[in-house]
Structures are given as C-alpha cells and as structure tokens.
C-alpha cells in the first residue's frame, strides 16, 4: 500500500464526488424518500469513502461506482 498525501486523497475524493455525486444522491433519495436525508446520506457516503480512499488509489477497487453505492446502502 502506497502512502498518499492529504492533497492527493482530497483530489481523489473530489473526482469521485464529481463523477458519482448525483447518482449517489438519487439512489439515497429512492431509499429514503426524503431529499434532505438523502443529501445527508450522500455526504456520509463520501466521508466513509474518504476513510478508505487509499484502497481506491491503490487500484484495489475495480468498480468505484458499485463501491460507492454499497457504502451508501450500508449507510
């Protein structure tokens, strides 16, 4: 496992949020049926993803969208 700077981790998270943020919010909205709660759940999803962002940067996560969706469902 490589060692990454905080800047690298933040850039990676920003990239994931840009690519998948809307999809995660929509899915959370379907599950929760409340857009305020869906926004909170989406935010929590990306916080949890950040805790494991090194795994994604190391290439251990092959399908980042599925990974994020699974985090959201478990949130």
Predicted regions and their residues:
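A short, charge-rich alpha-helical start-of-domain segment used by transcription regulators
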Residues: 2-26, 30
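Short amphipathic alpha-helical interface segments enriched in basic and hydrophobic/aromatic residues
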Residues: 18, 25-29, 46-54, 73-74
């Amino acid at each position: 496992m490589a060692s990454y700077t905080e800047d690298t981790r933040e850039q990676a998270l920003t990239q994931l949020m840009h690519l998948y943020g809307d999809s995660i919010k929509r899915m959370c909205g379907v599950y929760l049926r409340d857009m305020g709660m869906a926004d909170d759940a989406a935010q929590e999803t990306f916080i949890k993803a950040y805790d494991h962002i090194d795994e994604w940067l190391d290439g251990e996560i092959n399908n980042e969208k599925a990974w994020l969706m699974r985090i959201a469902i478990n949130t």
